[in-house]
Amino acid sequence: MRAAVFREVGQPLSLEDIPVPRPGAHQALIKVGRCGFCATDVAMTSGVGMNFPLGAAIGHEYCGEVVELGPDVTRLKVGDIVAGMPEGGCGTCPACLAGRPFDCFDGFTMMLGGFGEYTLVDERFAVRLPAGLSLTDGALVEPIASARRGAQMAPIDKDSRILILGAGAMGGGAAYWSRLRGGRKIVTSARSAWRADLMKEMGASEYLLAHELGEKLSGALGSAPDVVFECSGAPGMLAAAIDAVAVGGTVVCIGICTSPETLLLPQASYKEVSLRFTAAYSVADFQATVDAFDRGAVEPRKLVDRIIGLDEVPDHLENMRQGKTNGNKVHVDPTIAGGDH
């Protein structure tokens, strides 16, 4: 099978012919139907912080069709279309039993491979897609579930005043879930205006440029925000979120900054800010995302800009690394030879 393999830090992925993986206990082999690119793909191949394992076929926002079952599989069957969490665990520790293999300390393993023709999923951490959902929807489950994890950490109702810093997939996901949870005053902010319409389609009531926040934020929300979601992952933005939030408010850090951050802790202390961080998601987050899509809340489809083949994966990741892309979601369809669709 063909796959994009991480061979060298900071260098293009290598397109290679590698063996089709064989499913072990509780695992299923899936034929990948779609896989999305993510800023994590850049960060974890660049030598900054934690990296993917060298020699791994990467790609973690994937979905596909179950084509083979390993021993002891009881929850999936051949022909199921599934979105799989790109992690595996021991299956028996408290974290795994809670559907959180990301926190497993006994058997955590990365289950990547979405930028390839086949990959493995752990049946305990995979969710079936209903017939009405597309492969595009399936490959959006992972990032939108990640945003849900963060959105659930903040108290949100119809009276909440919400600020979202960053207009990428995480920012769009935060707007999406804030709206679904009843939020009505939702301001998204970023440095440029070109995503304003998209963020409003995702759930934001207003879009402000970053340099306008000081002047216009209170007018847009009525007062300082009760909740701030930091979704950009850019240096300095966590401090900006703490500065913006109301006294007694909540800041949730969804974006991951890999550079050191300088915070004036007395500012957060005097305001009695609740500061939360999120990592990954649970099976419940995956299922809730699939359920929301199945109810017709499919706005995240608008995040996907184009679909490419495996041949273009190395070049596209390098363009992302060099800041040459527009930031919209690009999906990979391993069944096409190349080119845009």
Residue ranges: model-predicted function:
Residues 21-35, 48-94, 125, 130-133:
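Glycine-rich beta-strand-centered segment in the early N-terminal region that forms part
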Residues 239-242, 283-341:
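C-terminal hydrophobic helical "lid"/dimerization subdomain
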Residues 133-212:
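Mid-domain Rossmann-like dinucleotide-binding core that forms the NAD(H)/NADP(H) cofactor-binding site
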Residues 5-22, 37-68, 83, 97-112:
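N-terminal glycine-rich cofactor-binding segment
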Residues 189-192, 231, 279-280:
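N-terminal Rossmann-fold cofactor-binding loop
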Residues 88-165, 301:
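NAD(P)H dinucleotide-binding glycine-rich loop of Rossmann-like/cofactor-binding domains
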Residues 154, 181, 197-274, 339-341:
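Glycine-rich cofactor phosphate-binding loops and adjacent beta1-alpha1 units
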